[in-house]
Amino acid sequence: MPVTVRWLGETPYDACFDAMRAFTDARTPDTDDEIWVVEHPPVYTLGQAGNPAHLLVADSGVPLVKVDRGGQITYHGPGQIVAYLLVDLRRRKLMVRTLVTRIEEAVIETLAAYNLASARKAGAPGIYVESGPHRGAKIAALGLKIRNGCSYHGLSVNVKMDLRPFLAINPCGYAGLETIDMASLGATADWHEVAQTLVRRLIAHLDGATAAAALPQQALEQSND
């Protein structure tokens, strides 16, 4: 099934949030699935069941946006890849848990492409460092919303960013959870390279393929809208 990839550059969170909901509400059975790849200015987002107490510093200077995804609080900022998955689960015959697992596998394979071992953790959505001095640190976050059988929101991967804003929150509701980025683990790939790798893996897994069958970049339908 075709997937349109939109490279949105640096875009304010509110604009993407409003656009995702509008896109999902306007979908028809023939609307192509889309992946939006974006980098946000600094912002905290709090899931619909999130506890505001997980924001530990009231005057951080970073705006807080309450959203309708699952999960607790997280941070988005420069140097982080955010990928929004606008997917018709019914058309692809996917259960929500299956979609989450495929997204997690795509992230794990992306990190492995840069010699970073990572894994999922039971009961804690996201991806975590598997070994070394930062074992257990969170390197990618995940949160979805399903409306009328279609997903929006998505995931974030920390590439090379200022990690200090994470110290002002309990990431995803876990007090004391370390958050790390790829650069701190020795990866030298830049944001754009990692984003291209991630998109290939995501599309492969949406189609139920293995990593070896990931689509070449020239096969992606792209738009800079």
Swiss-Prot record:
Stored Pfam families: LplA-B_cat (PF21948)
Key words of the record: Acyltransferase, Cytoplasm, Transferase
Binding site for substrate: R69, G70, G71, Q72, I73, T74, Y75, H76, A141, L142, G143, G154, L155, S156
GO molecular function, one term: lipoyl(octanoyl) transferase activity
Keyword Acyltransferase attributed: yes
Catalytic reaction(s) noted: octanoyl-[ACP] + L-lysyl-[protein] = N(6)-octanoyl-L-lysyl-[protein] + holo-[ACP] + H(+)
Primary localization: cytoplasm
BP GO annotations: protein modification process
Cross-referenced HAMAP family: LipB (MF_00013)
Record protein name field: Octanoyltransferase
Organism (species): Burkholderia mallei (strain ATCC 23344)
Gene of this entry: lipB
